[in-house]
Amino acid sequence: MTSPTPIYKLKKEPMRVAGFMSGSGSNLREILKYQKSLKNPSFRIVLIFSDVEDKNVCKGEKIADEYGVPYFCNDIMRFYSSKGLHDKKDMDVRKEYDKNTAELLKKFDIDLIALCGYMSLVTEDIFENFLTINLHPADLSIVENGKRKYAGLQAEGAVLKALLAGETHTRSCIHVVRKDADMGELLARSVPLEFMGDMSKIEDKNALKIISKYHLEVQKRVCEWTMYPKVIELIARGRFQKDKIGVLYFDDKPVPHGADMSEIQGISEHAQEHARVLDMSDIK
């Protein structure tokens, strides 16, 4: 039987990571903070890329300046507009856009792409040439009628669906990016975050939306800000592997539902550092 091999081929120098973002970049900022805290980092963010040039919307340039990382922006709506289009639905144009991005990534010798609130679907020129990972705000290991129940949902929409489905908690997941959205191999699931009490009797839709948004903000701090940097480090250290038939392993053990981050030493303690109490003024 052939042993599984690391999904990232180890090198002498740190793994070179590109962070893709479209908005606030809170996850990317936490990755950079974590990298900076390490004495001998196994990875480095060497490029920040954005598809949004509006500085009021995207904070990529600000984060890049803060941490001394090269920053490039190719506004995707401007790109589509140059083709006479007013939305970004045409995936043939997207492939052309991604082909240009891929050329930039090659110049930086990128090993891994971390999508951090990047709001454009990426195509084959990206994920077939570079190991690409994404974070999803719901538990993708839950299957219903043969499909991932919470695939294709974004932000508080994923949390709201979990709440309405009667889930007692949420988990964020990190997965490998493939052609079908949210359907790639599951790398990791975060520590669980319980809902605040029994929500089953709440019928006010607006109230449920506010609760979902609040829950997501806590989830970012407790689950995502802790998990994303750690998973990148674990990839860089060769601890995620894959066998010839595509089964994913963590530390040589098969993990069909991804590694459970609540079982990784230090994760739960680190999560609590981010778990400050929010008030409703935090929800915008």
Feature annotation, model-predicted:
Residues 1-284:
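One-carbon transfer enzymes
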